[in-house]
Amino acid sequence: ATMQVSNGEGSQWRIDMSVRGRKGFASILGLNLEQSTVFRVDGDTYVPLSQSTVRKAMFFGKKVTGVYNWQTASAQWDGDLKKERQQAIPLQRGDQSALSLNLSLMRDAQPGRSLSYRYVDVGRVRKYDYKVADATEVVQVGDLSYDALRVYRVNSGDNETILWIANGVPTPVRILQRDKGEDQVDLRLVEYQGA
């Protein structure tokens, strides 16, 4: 997987994430996921402007794009998704896309804090609540070792999301997603390059 943040025109930024299935069933299916969010920074808030998701596999492909229109205070997606998820969604200040949410967690994670965000992405609205561990822990990722804060979603039911965030590292050093106790996605930072 790769994650990249780049400066666009003026005050606009873009965050891209690309995941390639290289092990197990994901490798057999040739599963690939590409996500992108264009956003601007308004004070201490990441403001998403547009979002796209492309999923590819051996037997299917899906593409979804969305626009966050802050002048009309609504967001809307089109592409390969259900009709009810193509309806306009009223926006609220501070709403986050999946990728801008990761940036917000990186910025906001402090020992012992509780964090809350409204996730608006791919035609869905959800409240995401997180708890940050009281202290850092050593996280081994390949040959690298990080002193990182564990940040975990507390209102996700059987679907767990845990991130490990290290001071001075521009992305989470690890993102683990579990469904009913089974690891589904385990992304680990094995290398990063500065600007």
Predicted region positions:
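Hydrophobic, well-structured mid-protein blocks that either form specific transmembrane helices
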Residues: A57-N102
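Short, mixed-charge, low-aromatic patches
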Residues: R85-P90, M106-A109, Y119
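Acidic, serine/threonine-rich low-complexity disordered tracts
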Residues: A1-W70, D108-A195
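Short, polar/charged, low-complexity connector loops/linkers at domain or secondary-structure junctions
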Residues: L99-P111
